[in-house]
């Protein structure tokens, strides 16, 4: 018994030591890990949100290109609204075990690129959350939390408020045709003894967490109704319908593919060069708002039969000259919406264009090109020069309502919804 207790304490200390150094809730630490997906069972395009009352499960899956069995485990950690650790004992927010082995896996069958496909659902009979809030899931090898391979975020909501929201044109004539304003009301009848500034609103556009907008004070309080309708707080550049790439077949070229190259190591897919759309007219096109779907037009088992290819993206800048003072990124779930070297486009002096190669699994992808000012510490991402901004664009806005009750030690997620602008 004493030995078991020491082992348990060691595991808990290891998890806490890792969490103390964890900042990014979506990070891949092992380059052989690909196609990480975390979503509600049955809806691969939805935000990974669990209802505290219903315990609807998430499916978590990933591929390991090392193509040999690995002994993977997972654990979860409660975070605050700013994605810093809540620093609570796991016993305060979790029922069951916080170190669980991933037992469901399969081996790729007809794909040239060999891989192991792992998946599991959460919550499950071994582990379930007892508190609402932000969470990260950590997957690691050999029951050692120091051998982390990736982290990914998810949410647990305890619905205590109702949200009424809409997307409006800003009143400011300078941005009314290029931006969209999120306007919302939060009904708080179920809450008691709270101050309006204890409520925090966060809004993200098209599943990008790295440029979320936050509001801590409502514009109006009408009884139990909090209204947020400022002309400056929740305004987003509209962008355009995102670019798309159909990789469901490596034999038949879709409209966006320039050519295929068959090599001994697999397939290379060269995407047709992309150019700025800043001055092109807006047209309606139903996209998946930066998400991707794993599918295959020639097989029935996408998890295990879909192949991988090296996909080469090319962006041709104006005048074919390098951008001065700005960094160009490939944005979308295909790069995990990261703003780092995994998504950064590099200028090729020979082709006089920016290029980025990604190893992608067969499926359907949507993406955009974004700019970031190198001199600005934390700027809003700029789509205007590469994509253009049009009020008519359909975008997905996910709204999170957080509450820190008096005496509480972490931020509770008490409301969530997703609303679409100009849905066609």
Residue ranges and their predicted role:
Residues 271-324, 413-424:
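Basic K/R-rich, polyanion-interacting modules in nucleoproteins and related proteins
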Residues 156-179, 390-415:
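Low-complexity, Pro/Ser/Thr- and charge-rich linker/hinge segments at domain boundaries
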Residues 81-83, 127, 141-149, 208, ...:
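Short acidic/polar inter-strand loop motif in beta-rich domains
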Residues 29-78, 175-186, 298-314:
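Contiguous beta-strand segments within globular domains
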Residues 1-22:
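Bacterial Sec-dependent N-terminal signal peptides
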């Amino acid at each position: 018994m004493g030995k078991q207790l020491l082992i348990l304490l060691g595991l808990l200390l290891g998890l806490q030591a890792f969490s103390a150094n964890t900042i990014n809730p979506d990070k891949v630490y092992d380059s052989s890990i690909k196609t990480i997906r975390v979503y509600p069972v049955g809806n691969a395009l939805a935000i990974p949100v669990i209802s505290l009352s219903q315990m609807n499960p998430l499916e978590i899956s990933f591929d390991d290109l090392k193509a040999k069995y690995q002994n993977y485990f997972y654990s979860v950690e409660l975070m605050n609204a700013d994605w810093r650790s809540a620093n609570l004992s796991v016993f305060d927010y979790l029922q069951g075990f916080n170190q669980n082995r991933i037992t469901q896996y399969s081996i790729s069958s007809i794909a040239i690129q060999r891989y192991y496909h792992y998946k599991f659902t959460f919550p499950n009979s071994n582990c379930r959350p007892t508190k609402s809030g932000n969470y990260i899931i950590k997957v690691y090898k050999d029951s050692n939390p120091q051998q982390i391979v990736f982290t990914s975020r998810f949410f647990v909501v305890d619905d205590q408020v109702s949200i009424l929201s809409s997307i409006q044109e800003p009143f400011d004539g300078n941005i009314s045709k290029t931006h969209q304003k999120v306007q919302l009301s939060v009904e708080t009848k179920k809450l008691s003894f709270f101050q309006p500034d204890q409520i925090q609103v966060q809004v993200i556009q098209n599943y990008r967490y790295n440029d979320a907008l936050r509001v801590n004070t409502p514009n109006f309080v009408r009884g139990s109704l909090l209204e947020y309708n400022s002309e400056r707080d929740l305004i987003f550049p509209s962008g355009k319908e995102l670019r798309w790439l159909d990789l469901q077949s490596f034999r038949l070229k879709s409209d966006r593919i320039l050519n295929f190259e068959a090599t001994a190591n697999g397939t290379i897919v060269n995407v047709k060069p992309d150019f700025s759309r800043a001055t092109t007219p807006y047209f309606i096109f139903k996209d998946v708002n930066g998400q991707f779907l794993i599918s295959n037009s020639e097989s029935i088992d996408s998890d295990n039969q879909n192949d991988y290819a090296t996909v080469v993206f090319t962006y041709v800048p104006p005048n074919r000259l390098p951008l001065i003072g700005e960094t160009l990124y490939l944005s979308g779930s295909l790069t995990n919406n990261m703003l780092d070297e995994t998504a950064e486009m590099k200028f090729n002096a020979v082709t006089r264009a920016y290029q980025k190669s990604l190893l992608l699994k067969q499926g359907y992808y949507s993406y955009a090109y974004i700019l970031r000012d190198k001199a600005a510490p934390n700027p809003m991402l700029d789509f205007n020069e590469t994509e253009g901004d049009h009020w008519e664009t359909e975008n997905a806005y996910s709204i999170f309502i957080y509450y820190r009750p008096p005496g509480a030690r972490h931020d509770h997620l008490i409301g969530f919804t997703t609303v679409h602008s100009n849905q066609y």
